[in-house]
């Protein structure tokens, strides 16, 4: 997994945290030295596990993060390839998997979310994003989604998706 023991001490069976308190502290410290930074307009982007993490920012820290773009996120580690998830979540699958699932926690979403996914993603099954979409609808949470037909993992790198992400952040963070 090529990560330090300190990283694993925080994130072991806890991908929902993934160091958010530290990241928020760093952003606040940077803003203290750079008054041009507006902490009322913080966005986050991530792809794959970073997509899971970007959405989690709005679930666990929606009081800080205002908008997120999640590209091809593995939103529930119970439906992803187990060899990858075991590195971070352990085996066997237990209650901690459900607690860390964006799908089971979607009702806690605060802020503006854009989900991007590729129709032909062979790394993270698109059903992971569909599961989150279903949970968001059931929780009556607003969100945007962009499907890139014919695209695989990393659909957000498509030129059309790049423009849509920029538009999303401009709309959501500039008002």
Predicted regions and their residues:
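Short beta-strand immediately N-terminal to the catalytic nucleophile in serine-hydrolase-like folds
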Residues: 44-46, 71, 116
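C-terminal catalytic histidine-bearing segment of alpha/beta-hydrolase fold enzymes
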Residues: 2, 130, 137-175
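Mobile cap/lid helix-loop segments that gate and shape the active-site cleft of serine hydrolases
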Residues: 22, 66-67, 72-111, 138
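Short glycine-enriched nucleophile-adjacent loop
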Residues: 51-63
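Cap/lid segment of the alpha/beta-hydrolase catalytic domain
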Residues: 1-47, 53, 75, 80-83
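Acidic catalytic loop of the alpha/beta-hydrolase fold
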Residues: 120-124, 154-155
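Short beta-strand/loop motif that positions the catalytic acidic residue
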Residues: 109, 115-117, 121
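Residue-level signal for short, function-critical loop segments
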Residues: 48, 119, 151
